[in-house]
Amino acid sequence: MPNTDVSSLSMLGQQTETAQSPEQAVLEKVPSNHAGTDYVVRFTAPEFTSLCPMTGQPDFAHIVIDYIPGEWLVESKSLKLFLHSFRNHGAFHEDCSIYIAKRIVELLDPKWLRIGAYWYPRGGIPIDVFWQTGKPPEGVWLPEQGVATYRGRG
């Protein structure tokens, strides 16, 4: 029988406030009922927002997170609120992208994780950030992230 114990979760099914910073945001996990099976979980945040640490202007990204769970899954509402906590947070693109991935890795200890952060241009230059924990296990179906390279008017 699947493990559906959610008693340790503090946000799911509750009214919650958005944390004012990523450091304050709570990420929660739930047990995986298929820990012995290698499969990919994908989260896509096509409207991720943070602030430029120098100008305070908004920065926007399309973020794709793929991971192969071990014993745990990230609870999706907590992930949504964690990502939303960057809205008023000033940090460079690279820092936001890697921080997100490392927080998830710290929480879950997944078998594998990758992040693709496709940032929209500021100052005329798009910045894309890619990171993964290592090679994915053999035989896992790993779709492309499907985000087109920024072309502007080209």
Swiss-Prot record:
A GO CC term assigned to this protein in UniProt: cytoplasm
Pathway annotation from the record: tRNA modification; tRNA-queuosine biosynthesis
Sequence ranges of Polar residues compositional bias: 1-23
Active-site residue list: C52 (thioimide intermediate), D59 (proton donor)
InterPro entries to which the protein is assigned, alphabetical: GTP-CH-I_C/QueF (IPR043133), NADPH_dep_7-cyano-7-deazaG_red (IPR050084), QueF (IPR029500), QueF_type1 (IPR016856)
PANTHER family registered for this protein in UniProt: NADPH-DEPENDENT 7-CYANO-7-DEAZAGUANINE REDUCTASE (PTHR34354:SF1)
Function of the protein: Catalyzes the NADPH-dependent reduction of 7-cyano-7-deazaguanine (preQ0) to 7-aminomethyl-7-deazaguanine (preQ1).
Protein name per UniProt: NADPH-dependent 7-cyano-7-deazaguanine reductase
Source organism per UniProt: Rhizobium leguminosarum bv. trifolii (strain WSM2304)
Taxonomic lineage from the root: Bacteria, Pseudomonadati, Pseudomonadota, Alphaproteobacteria, Hyphomicrobiales
